[in-house]
Amino acid sequence: MLPSQSPAIFTVSRLNQTVRLLLEHEMGQVWISGEISNFTQPASGHWYFTLKDDTAQVRCAMFRNSNRRVTFRPQHGQQVLVRANITLYEPRGDYQIIVESMQPAGEGLLQQKYEQLKAKLQAEGLFDLQYKKPLPSPAHCVGVITSKTGAALHDILHVLKRRDPSLPVIIYPTAVQGDDAPGQIVRAIELANQCNECDVLIVGRGGGSLEDLWSFNDERVARAIFASRIPVVSAVGHETDVTIADFVADLRAPTPSAAAEVVSRNQQELLRQVQSTRQRLEMAMDYYLANRTRRFTQIHHRLQQQHPQLRLARQQTMLERLQKRMSFALENQLKRAGQQQQRLTQRLNQQNPQPKIHRAQTRIQQLEYRLAETLRAQLSATRERFGNAVTHLEAVSPLSTLARGYSVTTATDGKVLKKVKQVKAGEMLTTRLEDGWVESEVKNIQPVKKSRKKVH
């Protein structure tokens, strides 16, 4: 049997309508936070998406007249805070919310501020390459602006000590997180510029969330970096963390350790450069000596090939000139070597590698001594060969023959007389002796009879 009072019977349409009215009147407007997913925007301009958290989700719609007041483009995975009305879509019985307003929540809001400041400073030209200052090469003093207790400072000092232990470092401690951090960072940058002790600054901190790194997205910090006369290397967080300070800085390093690598020089590389320079100097000296020796050999060969009585004086003069040129060239070479040594010594003194500098100086002095001794020995040998050549030439000279008591007689036509049949009585003859000439007239001609007969 049916009870005396029958329960109300709803049609599906009436049920959905009743539930919709209950939701709209009883709940009113609510604030909801969640993560956006399945975001779509059809041609109508309306937005359709899902808000979800770890355990639930709800369908959302935001009509065109509402979403055009939103100042950012919603992205998949973005956390937002919405003001909405709860309703039911009667044809399908789907429960949904109608969003009236939307704003980023948490990091979403920070991300929006980040993009707005980035666009503003970029429009002002603070990111332009023309304002980027070159880093000093090499750096003579490095300033570090970071927390004195953070891991970033430890990493920077560790790298600098390993790569360039003689490089001075000045630390400007400052907070890198919290409400007071931007002001302290700005004052540290201004202090470094006032003291003018450093020629490059590292500004940064270790990794963290967007909120942790937010001090380096502050407009005051960005403008202080841009106004710094000292080149600034930003080193904020990890390689994937990009802040406004990175865009304004003269150079962005992906990590604090990388920043220390950038501003320092590798001491081992410097020593290799010194070794390479020394080898080039030795090769230049060897080439110079070989070239001078070859030139001297050529001159000596030409001296031997020419007639000594005609070329002796000129070759001697040329030899003296060559000797002077060689001495002058040697002095210049030694002077340049000394100047190069002084430059290398100054560069090495800046890095304080004293033991290697001392060995390099000793090596150069030895080379200079060897070079001077080699040239002296060659010049001595040359003089000895030259004296021997003069002695030999004097020995075979016709003048030496005259000195031994011989003479040379010529006719009036200048021909040397070898037989009596070349002259006649009454002719005038000229005789060359060691100390002069004698003219004589032929009075008598008397041939010498041959003492031997020819054998047939």
From Swiss-Prot:
It is found in: Cytoplasm. It catalyses: Exonucleolytic cleavage in either 5'- to 3'- or 3'- to 5'-direction to yield nucleoside 5'-phosphates. Keywords: Cytoplasm, Exonuclease, Hydrolase, Nuclease. GO terms for cellular component: cytoplasm; exodeoxyribonuclease VII complex. It comes from the Bacteria. The keyword Nuclease applies. Signal peptide: none annotated. Its EC number is 3.1.11.6. One of its GO terms (molecular function) is nucleic acid binding. GO terms for biological process: DNA catabolic process. Bidirectionally degrades single-stranded DNA into large acid-insoluble oligonucleotides, which are then degraded further into small acid-soluble oligonucleotides. Heterooligomer composed of large and small subunits. Belongs to the XseA family. This is Exodeoxyribonuclease 7 large subunit. It comes from Escherichia coli O157:H7.
